[in-house]
Amino acid sequence: GVSWIMGEWDMDASIGYGKNKMAFTIENTLNRSIGPSSKTEFEAGGFSYDQLVYNLTGVRSVDMASMASPVNVAVGAEARREGYKLFAGEPDSYRFGGVMLPNGLPAPPGAQVFPGFRPANESNTHRTAIGAFVDVEANLTKELLASIAVRGEHYSDFGDSLAGKLALRYDFSK
């Protein structure tokens, strides 16, 4: 990130990216529906998540004679892109191999511990969100701190969200 001063404002801007991936390997099992030739280890698929975040924040203090401390004001904006991907496992981890049980019913398909994700389960989705916030905080008296904040966001997949916060803290030790 980068920090700088712009007039009375302490500014901060940053970009962050993160990703995680989880893949399932199933061991010491078999796909009973394949029969005796079934292997005992399967790559059963998995999923990944990634997030790219840009943000800009400004903070400043404003002296007000009616307050016991300067009023702290913070404003900011954030843009985010999130991605989720679910990927299929190898076919033997989920497929039906054709073996029938002695009672005439089909053997359950897929690895017995966890039948892998199928191609029909695959997804590769993304969404974006843009948000902004305002936070104001000050001591109303020497002992009483008040804070109020509001944050609005717009999500590409489900619309708008508005959240607020109101807090009071009394310091009994002063």
Which functions belong to the PLM regions below?
Residues 144-155, 161-162:
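Transmembrane beta-strand segments that form the barrel wall of outer-membrane beta-barrel proteins
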Residues 13-15, 77, 150:
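Glycine-rich, histidine-containing beta strand-loop boundary motifs that form or position
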Residues 11, 21-26, 82-88, 98-99, ...:
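Outer-membrane beta-barrel proteins
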